[in-house]
Every structure is written in C-alpha cells, then in structure tokens.
Amino acid sequence: MKMHIARDSIVFLLNKHLQNTILTNKIEQECFLQADTPKKYLQYIKPFLINCMTKNITTDLVMKDSKRLEPYIILEMRDIIQMMFFRTLQKHMFFKEHTDLCTEYAQKIEASCYHYTYQQQEKTFLEEYSTRCGTINHIINCEKKSHQQQDNDALNKLISGELKPEAIGSMTFAELCPSAALKEKTEITLRSQQKVAEKTSQLYKCPNCKQRMCTYREVQTRALDEPSTIFCTCKKCGHEFIG
C-alpha cells in the first residue's frame, strides 16, 4: 500500500510541472518496472523530478545519482521563494509601478539561485539553496537598516538594467555590492594593522577579584565610526573581561 501511495504522489508532482499525462505516466512506469524495491524506485525517479523542476526533462534522460537532493520539498518551495523575492522587490516604488517586471525579475532571480546551487552540491541542496536565496533577498532589500541603505548597489543596477536578474544567483558579494565589499575590506585591513600594545591602568575593576590592577588594549572590532572595544586582563587573577 505504501508503494501505491508513493507512486500516486510522484505522478501528481511530475504532471503538475509537465502538464502531460501520457509522458508523466510513461516516465513513472519505466522507473517502477526497473525497481525491485521502494528505495530503488525513488532513486530512479529522483533525476526526473529534479530535471522537471528546471524544465529540462526528456524521455531519454540518463538515470544517475541525484547527490542527496530533496526534490519533494523543493518542488513546493520554489513558488514560495519566488513570492518572497516578489514581495521584497515590490517594497521599492519602481517595482510597485511595474508589477509585470517585478514578477519576471522575481522568477529569474529564484531560477538563478536554483541553477547556481544545483552546480555546487557540496552541502545538501536544500540547505545551500535556502541560504543562497536568503543572502540575495537581503542584498536586494531596499528597507535595510539606515547604515546599510547606501549599499544598495545591486538593487540600483537591477532597476537600471545594468544587472540581469538571471545572473544574480551566481555572483559574489563583491560583484553585487562593490561599495560594501570595499568598505568591509578596508575595515579588516585597518584592524589587522592597528597596534594592540597593552597598557596598565587602575581605571578598570576586575569583576572576578575586584582589584584595579589591569592591563588593557583597544581593538577596533566594529565600524570605523564606532568606539573601539577595550579588552582587559587582571594582573592579579588573570581574568579577562571587556572594559
């Protein structure tokens, strides 16, 4: 009985995307006849489901290992991700006024993330795909925190046409946000070059032994326009704390 339930579900998922009942039944039947266990049946059908999602399915597709992909979840997830991108883009006035373009870009951005992830395969597909989509969604969000609003390079290029939505999924952070990447690189370089010489002071009280015999050093751990972080070490008990 479990095998029949699984087969019905597979037929439904395949036909949902193929929109061709004859081809769907033929593919599913071939996989079923070649499999002698439910596990092998699922192994055989997976490549067809995966290619179905990318709309590249053919009757002569070679069956091979799908590298731990989770096709059943992804089939339903892609529509949800596309809607997420659509809502994020629509926060910008330009896309509110161009709904058709917003829909097109949302679909192409999601497809770009999908194909990029499909080529990676170092992690499980679902984990990599979700992470990639979340990163891209943050980058194109025009409602970032105030100190991040000037870093909307990718969104501005998307609107101007300089950046193609179908290419965004495979681009690096430096390619998508050159201004933010340069700023981050500058901060890292500055932190690595700064002097961290320790000084002795009685200004800081050790929370462990309550003594005021401490060495301290200042390190720029946050943005350049924010105060340095002071790391203290008690000379009496060796306890380390932030001043």
Swiss-Prot record:
Q: Which family does it belong to?
A: Belongs to the TFS-II family.
Name of the protein in question: Transcription factor TFIIS homolog
Q: Which InterPro entries match?
A: TF_IIS-typ (IPR035100), TFIIS_cen_dom (IPR003618), Znf_TFIIS (IPR001222)
Signal peptide coordinates: none
Map the zinc fingers (TFIIS-type) to residue ranges.
Answer: 202-242
Supply the alphabetized keyword list: Early protein, Late protein, Metal-binding, Transcription, Transcription regulation, Zinc, Zinc-finger
- Report the protein's function: Putative initiation factor. Necessary for efficient transcription elongation past template-encoded arresting sites.
**What's one Pfam family here?**
Zn_ribbon_TFIIS
Q: Which organism is it from?
A: African swine fever virus (strain Badajoz 1971 Vero-adapted) (Ba71V)
GO BP terms, alphabetized: DNA-templated transcription
Molecular-function GO terms, alphabetical:
nucleic acid binding; zinc ion binding
